């Protein structure tokens, strides 16, 4: 089936199923283009709650579909590629987290949304890269166990007076962006501003002109007087940047900054998920209710 036919069929089935398509900025360009809403993790969570559709097709990795299912238990959430998992989410386990909580009984667990529903259920509050600092600063506790990303934990620690106890996880895609990569690109494009995602290594963030979530990076590039930008995150964001400010130039900091899991979802899989209503995301009730409390606490935090 040609791409134009795929798109038309997807549109027909969206109407038939009363479905909405949500996609992360790291998705394939053609998937972003057929989505009703494209955003970062915080924006996608907020949009899922706002939706009145019966079916949510979530073009992303498994934890994203789980979050939508937790927040919208009355909706059918479909994940076009059920094997699209997040390596970082798999770096934290329940038993290990429980041991850490026992070691630090006065600490509050802040869970980055890039984690499983079970880990969210073991946490007090969730956060995204867009609101992590505000979430941590909203807490009364002075100690925070931050899971699973040590790089985001380090970024938050540099912007709070709280004691951060980091979990030893990381995003492989962001972690392999090196300081040397940035310096080479800066030498090649001396007029370009370097904007970076807080999942990057601390030594990479030290070189950044601006640090933000994916949506924050788009807004910065759009509103900045600069005309060129080196992008320190997954390469899929370039599509959103070009759409937001097509007159500007963008350079991916590394050719290796590509998440294989996020690229697993394609138009064919979106179509099949709508045709067969397959890969429905389910979360056990006892996990869902506790995880929802952590997500709801996050959504209640006001950000700048």
From Swiss-Prot:
Belongs to the quinolinate synthase family. Type 2 subfamily. Its EC number is 2.5.1.72. It is found in: Cytoplasm. NCBIfam families: nadA, PRK09375.1-2. This is Quinolinate synthase. The gene is nadA. It catalyses: iminosuccinate + dihydroxyacetone phosphate = quinolinate + phosphate + 2 H2O + H(+). One of its GO terms (cellular component) is cytoplasm. It is an enzyme of class 2 (transferase). Pfam families: NadA. Pathway: Cofactor biosynthesis; NAD(+) biosynthesis; quinolinate from iminoaspartate: step 1/1. [4Fe-4S] cluster binds at residues 86, 171, 259. Iminosuccinate binds at residues 24, 41, 112-114, 129, 197-199, 214. The keyword Metal-binding applies. Its cofactor is [4Fe-4S] cluster. Catalyzes the condensation of iminoaspartate with dihydroxyacetone phosphate to form quinolinate. One of its GO terms (molecular function) is quinolinate synthetase A activity. It comes from Methanosarcina barkeri (strain Fusaro / DSM 804). Binds 1 [4Fe-4S] cluster per subunit. GO terms for biological process: 'de novo' NAD biosynthetic process from L-aspartate. Keywords: 4Fe-4S, Cytoplasm, Iron, Iron-sulfur, Metal-binding, Pyridine nucleotide biosynthesis, Transferase.
